């Protein structure tokens, strides 16, 4: 009798994706972050659903409803903090996942890479809109500042901003539509994840060596299901430690003050995972230039496959490229730090230098160094 998982129309798809999937035998723990992102998405959708049952998307009651969730709803406080810190864990896994793709040359799988970039933009949009919902000071002013950037678009900018706001300022209409989008986008993300996996399974996974693994495959289950479960265990330990011991560590104290359009916080800044892009935005004195740099800071990932000059796919045996990769990582840490600082000397200068370095490494230095490595290896 044939196994049901190989014949049933639905189970057949699951089987070929997660059980009998031929996987390279040498993929390391850096490949765990894909499954962790799936776990993050599931956690966010489930906790978000329970929060939406008690939340009210109205400017007069939004802040109170979040307080009500934390004080009066059974286990509401932990659901709220799992959701809020889940976003931070989501982005931590996302950044590592993208970094791994750059390091080991996974960007050569063009469809998978480009869908991944679309996913990154969608997750960023979802997180931004979610940050507005508690209707605290930083929620309100963050929404005002970031949406106002669209007014830099020539000719249609002002109309576009007022259209997004649903009026002449961030108000009830804005909050209602942001809640609607914040609710629907995770399901769109889930659909995009399916497309991401579809394209990934067309080519098969990359591996640390960056060479074809067709001659040495192992079934996904039990080897990588166990490995992913171990990764998930470590992830949950870190996540729950954050939730139970320091739930407000990554948040902003200003968001515990109800939104007040008449009082501007001394320093408007987004959540930590947007700070690097925010620092790049602020490092350019011109508004339109800043917005373009902000978009390019993520969109630049689409250029990486076109800028690849190396004959080796992975950076595993390319020490110069490795050094550059870690300089780029350090540069992103510096940009994140600068994004959280006041707009004053010396932070302005440091931010500008770090922004120039960020674009230079990706667009100029890395392709040049890769050509040098080809010469050194006589390729």
UniProtKB/Swiss-Prot annotation:
Keywords: Electron transport, Heme, Iron, Membrane, Metal-binding, Mitochondrion, Mitochondrion inner membrane, Respiratory chain, Transmembrane, Transmembrane helix, Transport, Ubiquinone
SUPFAM superfamilies: a domain/subunit of cytochrome bc1 complex (Ubiquinol-cytochrome c reductase) (SSF81648), Transmembrane di-heme cytochromes (SSF81342)
MF GO annotations: metal ion binding; ubiquinol-cytochrome-c reductase activity
Lineage: superkingdom: Eukaryota
Primary localisation category: mitochondrion
Cofactor: heme b
Membrane-spanning ranges: 33-53, 77-98, 113-133, 178-198, 226-246, 288-308, 320-340, 347-367
Database matches in PROSITE patterns: CYTB_CTER, CYTB_NTER
Membrane topology: Multi-pass membrane protein
Any GO BP: mitochondrial electron transport, ubiquinol to cytochrome c
InterPro entries referenced in this protein's UniProt entry, alphabetically: Cyt_b/b6_C, Cyt_b/b6_C_sf, Cyt_b/b6_N, Cytb/b6-like_sf, Cytochrome_b, Cytochrome_b_C_euk/bac, Cytochrome_b_N_euk/bac, Di-haem_cyt_TM
GO CC annotation: mitochondrial inner membrane; respiratory chain complex III
Residues annotated for heme b b562 binding in this entry: 83, 182
Positions bound to a ubiquinone: 201
Record-linked Gene3D superfamilies: Cytochrome Bc1 Complex, Chain C
Additional record remark: Heme 1 (or BL or b562) is low-potential and absorbs at about 562 nm, and heme 2 (or BH or b566) is high-potential and absorbs at about 566 nm.
Sequence similarity: Belongs to the cytochrome b family.
Role description: Component of the ubiquinol-cytochrome c reductase complex (complex III or cytochrome b-c1 complex) that is part of the mitochondrial respiratory chain. The b-c1 complex mediates electron transfer from ubiquinol to cytochrome c. Contributes to the generation of a proton gradient across the mitochondrial membrane that is then used for ATP synthesis.
Subunit structure of this chain's protein: The cytochrome bc1 complex contains 11 subunits: 3 respiratory subunits (MT-CYB, CYC1 and UQCRFS1), 2 core proteins (UQCRC1 and UQCRC2) and 6 low-molecular weight proteins (UQCRH/QCR6, UQCRB/QCR7, UQCRQ/QCR8, UQCR10/QCR9, UQCR11/QCR10 and a cleavage product of UQCRFS1). This cytochrome bc1 complex then forms a dimer.
PANTHER family for this protein: CYTOCHROME B
Protein name (database record): Cytochrome b
Provenance organism: Cheirogaleus medius (Fat-tailed dwarf lemur)
Higher taxonomy: Eukaryota, Metazoa, Chordata, Craniata, Vertebrata
């Amino acid at each position: 009798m044939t196994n049901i998982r190989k014949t049933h129309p639905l189970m057949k798809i699951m089987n070929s994706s997660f059980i009998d999937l031929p996987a390279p035998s040498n993929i390391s723990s850096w490949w765990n972050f894909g499954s962790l992102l799936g776990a993050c998405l599931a956690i966010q959708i489930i906790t978000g659903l329970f929060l939406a049952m008690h939340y009210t998307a109205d400017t007069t009651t939004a802040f109170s409803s979040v307080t009500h969730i934390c004080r009066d709803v059974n286990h509401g406080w932990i659901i709220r903090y799992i959701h809020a810190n889940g976003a931070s864990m989501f982005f931590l896994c996302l950044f590592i996942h993208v970094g791994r793709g750059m390091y080991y040359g996974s960007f050569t799988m063009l469809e998978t890479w480009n869908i991944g970039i679309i996913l990154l933009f969608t997750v960023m949009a979802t997180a931004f809109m979610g940050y507005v919902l508690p209707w605290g000071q930083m929620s309100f002013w963050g929404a005002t500042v970031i949406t106002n950037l669209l007014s830099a678009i020539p000719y249609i900018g002002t109309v576009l901003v007022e259209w997004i706001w649903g009026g002449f300022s961030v108000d009830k209409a804005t909050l209602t539509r942001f809640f609607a989008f914040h609710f629907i986008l995770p399901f769109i993300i889930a659909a995009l994840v399916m497309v991401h996996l579809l394209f990934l399974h067309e080519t098969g996974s990359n591996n640390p060596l960056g060479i074809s693994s067709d001659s040495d495959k192992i079934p996904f289950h039990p080897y990588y299901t166990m490995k992913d479960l171990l990764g998930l265990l470590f992830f949950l330990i870190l996540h729950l430690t954050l939730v139970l011991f320091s739930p407000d560590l990554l948040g902003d104290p200003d968001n515990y003050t109800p939104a007040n359009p008449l009082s501007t916080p001394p320093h408007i800044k987004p959540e930590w995972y947007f700070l690097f892009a925010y620092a790049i935005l602020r490092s350019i004195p011109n508004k339109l230039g800043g917005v373009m740099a902000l978009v390019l800071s993520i969109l630049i990932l689409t250029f990486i496959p076109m800028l690849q000059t190396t004959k080796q796919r992975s950076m595993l045996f390319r020490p110069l490229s490795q050094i550059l990769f870690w300089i780029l990582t350090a540069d992103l840490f510096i940009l994140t730090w600068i994004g959280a600082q006041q707009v004053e000397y010396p932070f302005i200068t440091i931010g500008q230098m770090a922004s120039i370095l960020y674009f230079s490494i990706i667009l100029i230095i890395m392709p040049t160094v890769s050509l040098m490595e080809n010469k050194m290896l006589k390729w």
